[in-house]
């Protein structure tokens, strides 16, 4: 990045409902070289970084879009988006500390957009008694239910019973409706993780409906998988490491479903190309 903080983190990718456009959004944050997480939350960016593409190969220039200035945010972390078919808008959500409580607690806010240029005023999406960050949402069409997964960033167990640095679950029929908690002993047992992202396996990759929740062991190996055949149960199992292969130190990001044609185009353009100083870049 050559804009503002000069580095981006937590990339999130979404396909338009028409299927012909992709949007990528990310956190505007440089922490490498100073490691001052306090300042990053009090005096950080109030903007999202946005890119657009029609093919996953050719991308627009990056643009910085201010979304959290009106709440006097000290940061705008880990943005993600979910398309709302009820309103025809994207619901974009991120975590911010604000001056309202002297930058004391991370709260997840949301704003609506149709084009990733203009956004509505932010409103609260998730507020608990402890800090909450890194929300991700998935829709289960068989239940007609949304599930959202969020990190308890606080130093104590929150009111939903989620231990510090673990992931808690909520569900709702609508994106902006009432969300109710889903208990999970298994996620409570997986502490010191963040950046959850979840996807459903293709039908030919699993005999039954199966979902994979990736969680980022931020102090160690990075992403590892947790599996379930029943989102409503809230329970996940961690497969033996011998059953899968994860990229080295894969971190906070997004898997999406693509076509064979799209895959071939991406591989033709990028292949196995890694940036120079790739190991250093991973540590940033």
Label each region the model flagged.
Residues 3-4:
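Short, small-residue-biased leader/transition segments that mark boundaries at the very start
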Residues 46-48, 105-108, 164-167, 209, ...:
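Repetitive beta-architecture junctions, highlighting loop-to-beta-strand starts
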Residues 47-55, 107-114, 168-172, 225-230:
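Beta-propeller blade signature
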Residues 58-64, 118-125, 180-182, 235-245:
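Trp- and S/T/G-rich repeat-edge/linker motifs of beta-rich repeat architectures
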Residues 212-216, 221-240:
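C-terminal closing repeat unit and adjoining cap/tail of repeat-based domains
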Residues 11-40, 61-67, 76-111, 122-128, ...:
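Hydrophobic core segments of beta-strands in well-ordered, beta-rich domains
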Residues 187-197, 234-252:
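Conserved blade-ending motifs and adjacent loop-strand segments that build the rim/top face
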Residues 239-278:
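Blade-level signature of beta-propeller repeat domains, shared across WD40, Kelch, NHL, RCC1
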């Amino acid at each position: 990045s050559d804009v503002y903080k000069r580095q981006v983190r937590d990339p999130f990718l979404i396909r338009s409902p028409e299927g012909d456009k992709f949007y990528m959004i990310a956190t505007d944050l440089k922490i490498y070289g100073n490691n001052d997480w306090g300042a990053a939350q009090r005096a950080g960016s109030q903007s999202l970084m946005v890119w657009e593409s029609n093919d996953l190969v050719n991308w627009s220039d990056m643009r910085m879009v201010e979304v959290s200035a009106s709440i006097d945010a000290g940061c705008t972390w880990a943005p993600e988006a979910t398309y709302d078919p009820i309103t025809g808008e994207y619901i974009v959500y991120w975590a911010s500390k604000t001056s309202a409580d002297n930058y004391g607690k991370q709260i997840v806010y949301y704003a609506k957009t149709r084009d990733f240029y203009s956004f509505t005023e932010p409103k609260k999406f998730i507020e608990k008694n402890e800090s909450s960050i890194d929300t991700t949402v998935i829709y289960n069409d068989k239940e007609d239910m949304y599930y959202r997964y969020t990190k308890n960033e606080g130093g104590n167990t929150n009111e939903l019973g989620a231990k510090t640095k673990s992931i808690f679950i909520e569900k709702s029929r609508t994106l902006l409706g009432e969300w109710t908690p889903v208990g999970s002993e298994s996620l409570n047992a997986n502490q010191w993780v963040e950046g959850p992202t979840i996807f459903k396996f293709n039908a030919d990759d699993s005999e039954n409906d199966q979902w994979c929740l990736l969680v980022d062991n931020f102090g160690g190996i990075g992403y590892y998988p947790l599996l379930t055949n029943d989102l409503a149960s809230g329970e996940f199992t961690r497969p033996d490491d011998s059953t899968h292969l994860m990229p080295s130190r894969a971190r906070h990001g997004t898997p999406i479903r693509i076509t064979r044609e799209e895959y071939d185009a991406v591989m033709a353009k990028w292949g196995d190309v890694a940036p120079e100083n790739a190991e250093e870049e991973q540590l940033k």
